Amino acid sequence: MLVKYWMSKKVITVKAGDSMDTAIKLMKENHVKMLPVMKRDKLVGILTDRDLKKASASDATSLDIHELLYLLTKIKISGIMSKNPVTVPEDFAIEETAGVLIENGISGVPVTDPKKGNIVGIITQSDIFRALISLTGVGKGGIQFAFQIDDRPGSIKELTDVIRRYGGRMTSILSSYEGTPEGIRKVYIRMRSIDRVSLHELEEILQGMAKMLYMIDHRENNRKIYS
């Protein structure tokens, strides 16, 4: 899943020489929390709502409302923005981008064209969450089983073959080695199109095939934790 399919393509920017007041208005009008800062069509910084709050708190301690409004028109964005902004190319995968955000402790980044270098979008935590919801299939409801299985060829197929025999249609299959011993993996299978009687029989069979961690039936918000 590439960034270019999930980013916001409408990019609202400000100039380094613009005032803090201008940035506040742009964020409110466009319902954004991050503005790329440009100078001569080149990205020179990032301004976030956090930067604005920090600047307002430090510079407006003892000012009345009129002095504060005047101050907001005088403070330049170049003085409060974060310089040397982190960016990602539009052909980055969503999971790579999530790693960049975590590593740098930021909530979003400008997205660039890898050939031209110009800004083509913005990707934020919210966009990554949307991608995660789509990837897992949780928006489709259904049933999710979580297993701990042997890490060997065919171990996932054995489970999915049984699920298909009971009429289940796979919505998503995810796998992880996080927190597992050598030779073991966790697998999360989301399915739909299975009736409740078949589900009960399927559950018993799967328990005999692998270590089950939990089952969530979103149709009735029924949750079973096995381990």
Annotate each language-model stretch with its function.
Residues 40, 114, 175-178, 218:
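Short, ordered loop/turn segments at secondary-structure junctions
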